[in-house]
């Protein structure tokens, strides 16, 4: 996820304002920063690195002009380098663009432009935009028409801001499936990816909708892509700056849970990449997942998928244990290493050990990380930066990649079901108020248990991990059938047991386990289909989910209420769920 800012001031220098605005987007995560101003010549300063580091080297505020654009980049296409940092320009340097999103057909557009003589300087998808605008302006269009024509040629998501020295004093912005707001000041205007960037300058904003453009030139005009004027309402924001960074949510974790439907949609755009990687890998006889923590739980789901749908024997090994139990890897084994950061020390060491013995694939979120450079094959989750320490949206994005991998390797029917997952998630999020009320009644317990069978077992493990990470309550996840082999001794009056039981072949046996714990005084919190009257009857509390979610895709949807439950229990206990004690986002030591 990137952040873009633009401003057109009535007086004063734009560069210091842009620098201050992009600093307020640091929370989104980034690896590069850049600013372009127009006076009317376009001048650019940009580099990879933290804002303070780049500013110390380049003095980003020292650029002339009362208008400009700025960007903080989270790499998706091309490594974090000065060349790949935004803004990007056309051949002549007369047009500059900043962009948030992913252009899916950029390679074919780039090839077409190169055949016409355009020269590219970066590896990014974004650079096709200024070159397309240049092409259409050379044909006689103005900046507004050229930008609209360029965007109609592109597939994917975008929020952009464009300037041209051929039309000084004008900024054009547009959006599709990526947020862009307009800030309305006193005789001056702003564009931004998010409210916090501009709150120091105005609290009056216009929210652009998909397929809309805005033209700033001393005045403000919003149009559709055909140039028809669109009337927009100006909203007043009463958030504090801190709340605005979190999009109005109290914590990043809650914001990121609510971003999960869009995170899955973004991950699904990688389907062509998955198909390409599967073709490169070729035939495999065995799968071996290697991961830690939440990524390990995603791997367990992968084991159930590969074995039940494709019949491929699959192992799941903790990265920290890999050196002791790697087994017989060979050139017909696909070893899959999962890491949000791509820098997890245990996972990297396991990857290095496996590279000479098996086919290796890294599933990561951070472009250019060590895992992406060292694995033979790479797939990206495209979840964007995740600020909360406890993994939420990156978990469902990892799962989505695994499901796509299984689909590409022989179960294509999965894709139709995956396409509906964001819709199911959105319905699950609608029940947050009920989950918040539930959390208030069980925030003072000392133990919590999560049980499930089959595909629900990894969900039980992940639910327990989330709870103990951010609430500091002892939580354990168990295969429901294992209760009688020891854990049942820990069940006592009032102990919460979360029973995860989606529709499917494991449902009836899980219900028997629910009866076991009820007989020993447990407080049962049932999580199942909203139409599951048998589970509802046995449970003290019940969380109902869409009845079309079966056991196979349940890990993607049933985790949502468990994340919400953990979050609200943490808040009830007066804790900060974004920063749990003793934990770090990226574990770079063994």
UniProtKB/Swiss-Prot annotation:
SIS domain ranges (all copies): 277-415, 438-580
Domain Glutamine amidotransferase type-2: 2-219
Gene Ontology cellular component terms for the protein in this record: cytoplasm
Enzyme class: transferase
Principal location listed in the UniProt entry: cytoplasm
Location(s) in or outside the cell: Cytoplasm
UniProt-listed Enzyme Commission number(s): 2.6.1.16
Catalytic residues (positions): 2, 585
Disulfide bonds: none
Keywords per UniProt: Aminotransferase, Cytoplasm, Glutamine amidotransferase, Repeat, Transferase
Family matches, as SUPFAM superfamilies: N-terminal nucleophile aminohydrolases (Ntn hydrolases), SIS domain
Keyword hit for Transferase: yes
Protein's UniProt keywords contain Cytoplasm: yes
InterPro entries per record: GATase_2_dom, GFAT, GFAT_N, GlmS/AgaS_SIS, GlmS/FrlB_SIS, Ntn_hydrolases_N, SIS_dom, SIS_dom_sf
Reaction(s) the record says it catalyses: D-fructose 6-phosphate + L-glutamine = D-glucosamine 6-phosphate + L-glutamate
GO molecular function: carbohydrate derivative binding; glutamine-fructose-6-phosphate transaminase (isomerizing) activity
A Gene Ontology biological process term: protein N-linked glycosylation
Subunit structure: Homodimer.
HAMAP family the record matches: GlmS
Function, in words: Catalyzes the first step in hexosamine metabolism, converting fructose-6P into glucosamine-6P using glutamine as a nitrogen source.
Protein name per its UniProtKB record: Glutamine--fructose-6-phosphate aminotransferase [isomerizing]
Taxonomic classification: Archaea, Methanobacteriati, Methanobacteriota, Methanomada group, Methanobacteria
